[in-house]
Amino acid sequence: MSLLILLTAVFTSTASAGAREQAKRIHDRIAGVPPSAAVLDVMAGHISNGNAILAAELAIENPSFYDVTLKNFVAPWTNEAMTPFVALNDYTATVIGLVRDERDFRQILFEDILYIGDSRLGLPAYSTTNNAHYEALEASGASLKSSLQNVAQSTYNGLPPGATAGVITSRAAAKAFFSAGTNRAMFRFTLINHMCSDLEQVADVSLPPDRIRQDVSRSPGGDSRVFLNNCVGCHTGMDPMTQAFAYYDYEYNPDTDPDGVMGQLVYNTVNDIDPDTQSRVQGKYRINSATFEPGYVTPDDRWDNYWRKGVNRRLGWDWSRSTFGYGNGAKTLGMELASSKAFAECQVKKVFKNVCLRPPSNSDDYSKVNAMESSFRSQGFNLKQVFAESAVYCAGE
C-alpha cells in the first residue's frame, strides 16, 4: 500500500511538473518574458485540466505580448531592409491595436483605420510629416496594450476615406514603399509580407503582357528572349495590380532630406492634375517612358488581377465577391488580396514560425497549419487565436 501511495505521488508530481514546464514555455513564447508565480500556477492548472488554450490566452494578456512580441513581429514589414530594429510607427501600432482589439485581421489591407497614442499621455500630435508621435509613445514606456486608441485614418492623414487602405496607406509604408521608384515596391512588399510570396514565386510567363509599362525593356541587353522568358513573368501580374497605386506618392526634398524622414504621403484627388501626365496619375508612372514607347500608358487607378488565371489561381482568390478581379484604387486591391486563401495561410505560417521558432517542417506541422487556418477564418480572422493555438502546439518541444 505504501508503495502504491509513493508511486501515485511521484506520478502526480511528474504530471504537475510537465504542466508547469509547458505553461512556462507557452508564456515565454507568447510574451517573451517569464510568467509570475501566480500566473504560472493558473496556467498550469488550465493545462492539467485540458484547457491549454486558456493558458495561452492568459499569456496573451501580458503587456509584453504587445510591447515586445507583436512589435518585433510586425516591424520588419514596415521597411525594405525587413529589420525589426526600427522605431515604433503608425504601421506597427495599427497592426498591434487591431490584434489587441480582436478585429478582422484582413482589415489591415483596406480599412480606414489607424491607431495612435492615448491623448492623455501628452504626446506630440500625430503628424503626416514625421514620426515624432510614435517615437515619443515608445520612449514614454507606456504599454501598447493600454495606450493605443483607434481612430479613422482619413481624419488624420487627409486622405478621402475611399483612398485609405489600412497599413498600405500608413505613413511608414508610404515612406518605405512609395518613396521614389515606380510604386511597384508597395505591391512587392505587400505580396511578401501578407501573401508570403516574392515575385519570383508567382511569376507566370503565360499571361498577356498588354499592361506592362513603358519603362520595361522588351529586349534587355538586346535579347528579347530575356523579356519573354523572365521579365514578363513578374510584370504581367504586377503591373496591372500596381496601377491601383497610380494616384499615390511619398513626397520629400532629396537635397535637404535624402532619407525622406520629413516626407509625407500624397494622393491626387479628382481636382489634382499632375504636370507630367496631365491626369491624376503620378508622374512616376511615366518614368523612363522612352525605354519602350509602345508600352502601356497608365490612364487611371483601375487595377485587374491577371493572376485569377494561370498558375496563380492556387493563391485561392475569393470568387464569391460581386466585383472580383478588378477595381479602382488601393482599398479594393487590398480587399482582393486580403480575401485570398494565401493571405490567411500566410498569417498562420508567420505566427507559427514566430512562436515555434521554426517554420512548419513535417506532415504534423502542415496539418496543424491547415487546421489553424480554418480556425482563423471561422473565428473572424482573430490573430490572437493563432498565437494561442501555435503556442499550445509547440509547448511540448
Short names for language-model regions:
Residues 54-241, 338, 342, 352-355, ...:
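Extended surface/linker regions that mediate inter-domain or inter-protein docking
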